[in-house]
Amino acid sequence: MSKFMILYRSPASASEQLENATPEQKEASAKAWQAWATRVGYAITDLGSPLAHTTHVGPGTASTDGVSGYSILEAGSADEVESILEGNPHLAMPGTSVEVLEIIPIEDI
């Protein structure tokens, strides 16, 4: 089994999304995340957290689709991660995407 970092990308930061959400939307979002986490809990190493604004350091320009959160999952393959992510509430929001990165154990380097 390998660990995978899931980066939740969206055009607005998590804090901006929360600022603009109604109490009903916040409650519905929390319930959707709880339902997904319950369904795929076997694969969740770290459910993660929403992330605040991004600071860009270094040359070049920052991405317009910032990382608004993360999770760490454990699975046998990237294909398995794709099936685990089916029904993930983040993907139901307009303009969002998920980036899947396999974590390489430091002892394997």
Residue ranges, per PLM feature:
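Conserved, structured core segments of small domains
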Residues: M1-I109
